[in-house]
UniProtKB/Swiss-Prot annotation:
PANTHER family: AURORA KINASE A AND NINEIN-INTERACTING PROTEIN. Its main location: nucleus. The gene is Aunip. Keywords: Chromosome, Cytoplasm, Cytoskeleton, DNA damage, DNA repair, DNA-binding, Nucleus, Phosphoprotein. One of its GO terms (molecular function) is damaged DNA binding. Residues 273-347 are annotated as: Interaction with RBBP8/CtIP. Residues 301-325 are annotated as: Disordered. It comes from Rattus norvegicus (Rat). This is Aurora kinase A- and ninein-interacting protein. DNA-binding protein that accumulates at DNA double-strand breaks (DSBs) following DNA damage and promotes DNA resection and homologous recombination. Serves as a sensor of DNA damage: binds DNA with a strong preference for DNA substrates that mimic structures generated at stalled replication forks, and anchors RBBP8/CtIP to DSB sites to promote DNA end resection and ensuing homologous recombination repair. Inhibits non-homologous end joining (NHEJ). Required for the dynamic movement of AURKA at the centrosomes and spindle apparatus during the cell cycle. GO terms for biological process: double-strand break repair via homologous recombination; negative regulation of double-strand break repair via nonhomologous end joining; spindle organization. The lineage of its organism: Eukaryota, Metazoa, Chordata, Craniata, Vertebrata.
């Protein structure tokens, strides 16, 4: 047999039984009655002991992590409630620190005192009685809003304590936000008023409470503005009818505007229909055609002239002199006959 080269020997996997026997092996458990994570040789113990009793049933991950040997189910519940309380306290502390930072940054913001604060605390904080009254009113308003909009504090399971510090910090935050909104609205109003008073083109300005108005009024500008307002605000002319009953009698109360609108009447519609029927008629075949009056006899006036003026009837001079009376008195000037004897409009 040919001997394998060193390259082929390096590719194989060789197990040394003596080396395997020399490895350390875990022969016994660290604590009786517990199930620990198996540790490799040379590894440290875990910081959190993942233990579980024999007689207890695992219902949540918190009981598995925090339970220790010697505690029952009641102890697990107490540990869970204590963890929740600690978490709530940490959140309250962090929020109070943020509130302190907000107070340091925003010196102009008025902070309302709490309901538990005493007058001595208010004086030490530097609040005057008037400011404390104002802030107290504002705090009452905001707290009433928060009480109406939010439910009662939730009671923790297994304990009789409530989330009172969390609710109080939340109400404080709402109060500060409301006060900031009020101050921003006041600043905007003051800015608008200042822009109105500083405008040079304004004819009239707001008079100060303790001084006189020294800016002259431009009458022409005031009149122009008044006329523009009148033009923009077009009056609505309406007629209102009210029926009132007094002592058993019905009375009609009519209020009219100075320029009443034209009231629609059915007579106008009837007149239009009559005129429409006079203009059009039906022929022998049932088609709608223009109606021609047959009062005047048919005359051929193609080459006829106006006897009084000696002009053609179609000339603008004749029409301007006589006007519509010429057309009404002489209808034969409007109509003529064609080659078949039918009456047609004169062209």
């Amino acid at each position: 047999m040919s001997r394998r080269g060193p390259e082929e020997e390096a590719c194989g996997v060789w197990l040394d039984a003596a080396a395997l026997k020399r490895q350390k092996m875990q022969t016994h458990l660290l604590k009786l009655g517990t199930k620990m994570l198996t540790l490799l040789p040379g590894e440290r113990k875990p910081s959190i002991p993942f233990t579980q009793r024999r007689a207890t049933r695992q219902t949540s991950i918190t009981s598995f992590v925090t339970s220790q040997p010697g505690m029952a189910n009641g102890g697990n519940q107490k540990n869970a409630s204590s963890l929740k309380e600690n978490q709530i306290n940490r959140e309250c502390k962090s929020r109070s620190q943020l509130d302190c930072l907000d107070q340091g940054l925003e010196d102009d913001c008025l902070v309302s005192p709490l309901a538990t604060s005493t007058p001595a605390d208010i004086r030490e904080a530097g609040h005057s009685p008037q400011s404390s009254q104002i802030s107290g009113c504002q705090s009452l308003e905001t707290t009433s809003l928060t009480m109406m909009s939010f439910p009662q504090p939730v009671v923790l399971m297994g304990t009789g304590e409530s989330k009172a510090p969390l609710a109080s910090s939340f109400t404080q935050f709402l109060e500060r936000s409301c006060l900031l909104d009020q101050r921003e609205a006041k600043r905007k109003r003051e800015g608008l008023c200042g822009s109105k008073t500083d405008c040079p083109g304004m004819g009239s300005h707001i008079r100060p409470p303790g001084g006189k108005c020294h800016q002259p009024l431009d009458k022409a500008k005031v009149e122009k503005r008044a006329t523009a307002k009148e033009n923009r605000q077009a009056p609505v002319h309406l007629q209102t009818y009210r029926f009132g009953s007094h002592s058993g009698k019905k009375t009609l109360l009519v209020t009219k505007s100075p320029c009443p609108l034209s009231v629609f009447s059915w007579d106008i519609d009837r007149k239009d229909r009559d005129s429409w029927s006079q203009l059009f008629t039906e022929d022998s075949q049932g088609h709608q055609v223009i109606a021609h009056s047959t009062k005047m006899p048919f005359q051929d006036v193609t080459n006829a002239r106006n006897q009084g003026s000696g002009q053609f009837p179609d000339s603008p001079q004749a029409q301007g002199q006589d006007g519509p009376t010429l057309l009404h008195l002489q209808p034969h000037l409007l109509f003529t006959q064609d080659s078949e004897g039918n009456r047609v409009i004169r062209h």
